[in-house]
Amino acid sequence: TSPLRNYKDIDNAFEAMFDADATAVISTCEFDNKILKTFIKKSNGFLRGISNDKYPFMRRQDLPSTFMPNGAIYIINHKSFREENSLMTSKTLSYVMPKDRSVDIDCNNDLAKAELMFNAK
C-alpha cells in the first residue's frame, strides 16, 4: 500500500515507459549504496560479495547508485509478462520517486510514518 503516490506518478511512469520503449516500469527510490559492500556467507562458510567481490572494498563514492522498489507502481506489458513470467524484464525502467512519496505500508510503524508525512503536507 502506497498512499502517498499520486496520479501524476502513475501518468508519468506510463509516459516514461512509452518514451523509452520499455516493457515494464517499477517505481523506486534512491537507496544507500553501502548495501553493495555487504557479503553473503555461503554454505561452506566462505564469504562472497552480495553483487561482486570488488564492491566491498571500493570507496562508497565510487560505487554505483542503488535503487529500492518502493511498492507504489508496477507496470508491465502483458505480452512480456506472459513470456518471461516475471515483473522484471530485460527492458524494465526505473521510475524514481522522492522518498517523501515512497512510503510502503506493510506494518503499523509504516502506517504511523505515512500519517506523519501526509499531515506534514
Name these PLM-found stretches.
Residues 83, 94-96, 100-121:
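Hydrophobic helical membrane-anchoring modules
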Residues 1-4, 101-102:
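Short histidine/acidic/glycine/proline-rich micro-motifs that form metal-
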Residues 3-91:
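Conserved core of the sugar-phosphate nucleotidyltransferase
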